[in-house]
Amino acid sequence: MTPPSATGPAPVLLAYFSRPGENYYYGDRIDLEVGNTEVFANKISDLIDCDVYRIEADDPYPDSYDETRDRNVREQEENARPVIANLIGSIDQYQTVLLGSPIWNVRPPMIMSTFAESFDFTGKLIHPFVTYAVSGLGSTDETYAELLPSADFGESVAIQGETVTDSGADAEAWLRRIGLLA
């Protein structure tokens, strides 16, 4: 995680989960060195002053698309809470949280539920961002509203994974709409 800002207003936290490896790509598969959500998170962090925290599974997800899909289905069926490696100690200093993930089977991966339930988000402004192959935002807004009933929610954004490398203008426009970029 990048260190918190020493001066100025409460910093923004950009917390995201991303998986490199074999990914869906226009009906086929492609191997990614950097996951799509991380690519978009980097575009955001290049544009605004924020603290960046990458959510990582204690038991990493496989590089194989099929194995990851199967594990995700099991986790969703079991309502699992995968353990996060190196969970940050606190989010108290943040008023705004940009919460990023891929969409797996129409919702954020279950590790995002682990993260959401690990902290008190009361009064914090949450702006979800996701990358997807088919489902757009899926049930992202509903999922987080259920997990974080005491949080406030701003605009979400969904970026197609296949186009994420060209999404700089999308990141800039979204950050302007939510008031984080002048």
Range-by-range predicted roles:
Residues 14-16, 52, 99, 128-130, ...:
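Structural beta-sheet core signal
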Residues 152-182:
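Glycine-rich phosphate/pyrophosphate-binding loop and the adjoining helix
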Residues 2-95, 106, 176-182:
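N-terminal beta1-alpha1-beta2 submodule of the flavodoxin-like/Rossmannoid cofactor-binding fold
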Residues 21, 57-59, 133, 160-163:
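Residue-level detector of flexible, active-site-proximal loop/helix-junction positions
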Residues 55, 103, 159:
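Hydrophobic pocket-lining residues within nucleotide cofactor-binding pockets
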Residues 25, 65, 139, 166-167:
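Short, well-ordered secondary-structure micro-motifs
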Residues 34, 38, 42, 109, ...:
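Short, surface-exposed alpha-helical segments at coil->helix boundaries
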